[in-house]
Amino acid sequence: MSETLPRSDDLEATWNFIEPGINQILGNEKNQASTSKRVYKILSPTMYMEVYTAIYNYCVNKSRSSGHFSTDSRTGQSTILVGSEIYEKLKNYLKNYILNFKQSNSETFLQFYVKRWKRFTIGAIFLNHAFDYMNRYWVQKERSDGKRHIFDVNTLCLMTWKEVMFDPSKDVLINELLDQVTLGREGQIIQRSNISTAIKSLVALGIDPQDLKKLNLNVYIQVFEKPFLKKTQEYYTQYTNDYLEKHSVTEYIFEAHEIIKREEKAMTIYWDDHTKKPLSMALNKVLITDHIEKLENEFVVLLDARDIEKITSLYALIRRDFTLIPRMASVFENYVKKTGENEISSLLAMHKHNIMKNENANPKKLALMTAHSLSPKDYIKKLLEVHDIFSKIFNESFPDDIPLAKALDNACGAFININEFALPAGSPKSATSKTSEMLAKYSDILLKKATKPEVASDMSDEDIITIFKYLTDKDAFETHYRRLFAKRLIHGTSTSAEDEENIIQRLQAANSMEYTGKITKMFQDIRLSKILEDDFAVALKNEPDYSKAKYPDLQPFVLAENMWPFSYQEVEFKLPKELVPSHEKLKESYSQKHNGRILKWLWPLCRGELKADIGKPGRMPFNFTVTLFQMAILLLYNDADVLTLENIQEGTSLTIQHIAAAMVPFIKFKLIQQVPPGLDALVKPETQFKLSRPYKALKTNINFASGVKNDILQSLSGGGHDNHGNKLGNKRLTEDERIEKELNTERQIFLEACIVRIMKAKRNLPHTTLVNECIAQSHQRFNAKVSMVKRAIDSLIQKGYLQRGDDGESYAYLA
């Protein structure tokens, strides 16, 4: 360069002065340094400053000159010429400079492009500094005047590169880039650095003329991203199809994860963040969606194998596309439901097989025996087994996934409430699932003192609550539970009050205080009865004529009639004379404390203990647990060894049916001998009943009361069996029907109350809306059928609470 700076008003001289410097800054064939540090070392500081000064002098001089104006052909505006001429010179120079690039035979276009791009962009930065004064004043003024075709020098370099180098050759460049991507996917060595630089150039060339600071990815997206995504889909479509022909689906799942891992790594190294989402969607389509049926089938195979690790891997793959989760949830729900149903069917089949080995029964009788002799523990444990298996799979493979959690709940609710045992084929639509009753019996086994430790060792209150949450007929469970709970309370057979209270609290937490209201009140009655018993015992001991012989121990229970599952039936019965003094004193004592209250005596539910010294001389007396009716009969034998049925009737005032039912256990265990024997003679007045003296039995403590619970004729002639091997009869079926009737009545009352509440608030409602709201409100207690709601509506219309609208499809509330 010349040692003398050019005249500041001479454009040609100024350009001729700075052109060699620009050439040196941008580089030539011999000067292709690829980093800023290397370029800085090559450039002469003196030359750099002279270029800057010459440009500065020219722009300043022109700005001071007057009368030098130019009219812009695009806008028609006049501008002081402080840079436009030298700007145009530079623009033309850059075009020619880039056009003169030559690709060698030894390099690919990608290599050529990247090498030139690196040097050119470094030079553009230095050049931008050299033209700093023009950028800050002339360019900025032009752009502020709305001339968006004027750019700072660095941007001008990039725009020229795009126009001259990139646009004509972009297809070649992109094809070579995509070839490199394919080679990388095939595990071959690729030009990693060149790929990265070329991609960055595409981002850099996305310039928005209206706003140079705004990121514009239009070039990157249109030129590279779209063909890249298309190529990706084509490549992996072919790859996955070929892979699945030679490998198992399980192997494919792990391969798909590896592909995704590699592509995500490449994403962070090469591609712009904008590609992340569309690339993920493209991979999801070709790796997952296109093979979803195979993956769903494999899901079933893995569930069969209970292979949690592989299920987790499959879920991790499928969840990448959230739209596929409902399909996976549907497969999971159907599988769990079917498995639960099959497990119960297998349990029943095994149970039937065991019965057939021991009994010769016709199909109808076999079905009845199976239904009434299946162990509640076996049944509930089988339900829990299925639930626990799939809960574990859920918790370890896809925790917190809402659709799959819902699928598990739906499936468990389905097979727990509806299976071959709970609702056998042909059951009426109004039938209640037997699961509620079986869970109540399971609870009874757990909470009963008499249950052997080895039986209860693997049972817990958690089991009860787990199944309870899935019950659709929670009111049926409450009814059965309350009946068994009542027996435990009045017979004192509960393991402990704490255990009972714990279950009540957990049931309350799982449902509502209202749900356990009756059970809680029953518990309170027992506590108050204990206080009454203690007070009565103290009062008796204060009697002047007190003796244990005159006042035997008495354990009274005072129960609220509408809370307990016992229906009062007046029974003609003469209380044994040995119990009359205690009975009279109790009535007197209670009346004094609770004036006006009426006591109704439930004689059929009373039990007691008798000491019988009727064994061989020297043997300890027997302890008999008996019903009150049995006690009344046995006490008659203090005065005679042989009694006729007529004698017993006179002594007890009991009906023949009650006497016969009480006698069955005595005859069965040979405490009493019937003469003549046989069913027909059992109910004849002249039949004699002789007490066995001396009585021979291995046990000292004998429970005769338990044998009274079944129908007399069935007990003697054979029939079904309960869970403990006792013979079953018609009373059991009658009791089931009675419970079902009670449930239906309570449900009718509940639904009517629901309808009144709803209609009182809404006043007028269409039929469908009323039915749906009523079903929704009853969901926590039972699964209300439409027919049940219709009956309740009809009942309320008859009672005058509702009236049908003129359209026949709506109802109005009558205040």
UniProtKB/Swiss-Prot annotation:
Query: Could you tell me at which residue positions the Glycyl lysine isopeptide (Lys-Gly) (interchain with G-Cter in NEDD8) crosslink is annotated in this chain?
Result: 760
The Cullin neddylation domain, residue ranges: 746-807
Q: Does the keyword Heme apply?
A: no
GO molecular-function terms, A-Z? DNA replication origin binding; protein-macromolecule adaptor activity; ubiquitin protein ligase binding
Where are the residues of the annotated region Required for interaction with CDC34/UBC3? 448-748
Would you tell me the Gene Ontology cellular component terms?
A: chromosome, telomeric region; cytoplasm; nucleus; SCF ubiquitin ligase complex
Ranges for region Required for interaction with SKP1/CBF3D and F-box protein:
9-280
Consequence when changing residue 488 to C: Prevents CDC34/UBC3 interaction
User: Pfam families annotated for this entry?
Assistant: Cullin (PF00888), Cullin_Nedd8 (PF10557)
What main location does UniProt list?
cytoplasm
Extract one GO BP annotation from the record: protein ubiquitination
User: What does UniProt say on post-translational modification here?
Assistant: Neddylated; enhancing the ubiquitin-ligase activity.
Q: Which UniProt keywords apply?
A: Cell cycle, Cell division, Cytoplasm, Isopeptide bond, Nucleus, Ubl conjugation
**Remarks, anything else?**
Present with 377 molecules/cell in log phase SD medium.
Family, as annotated: Belongs to the cullin family.
What is this protein's function per UniProt? Core component of multiple cullin-RING-based SCF (SKP1-CUL1-F-box) E3 ubiquitin-protein ligase complexes which mediate the ubiquitination and subsequent proteasomal degradation of target proteins. As a scaffold protein may contribute to catalysis through positioning of the substrate and the ubiquitin-conjugating enzyme. The SCF complex associates with CDC34 as the E2 ubiquitin-conjugating enzyme. The functional specificity of the SCF complex depends on the type of F-box protein.
Listed name of the protein: Cell division control protein 53
Gene of this entry = CDC53
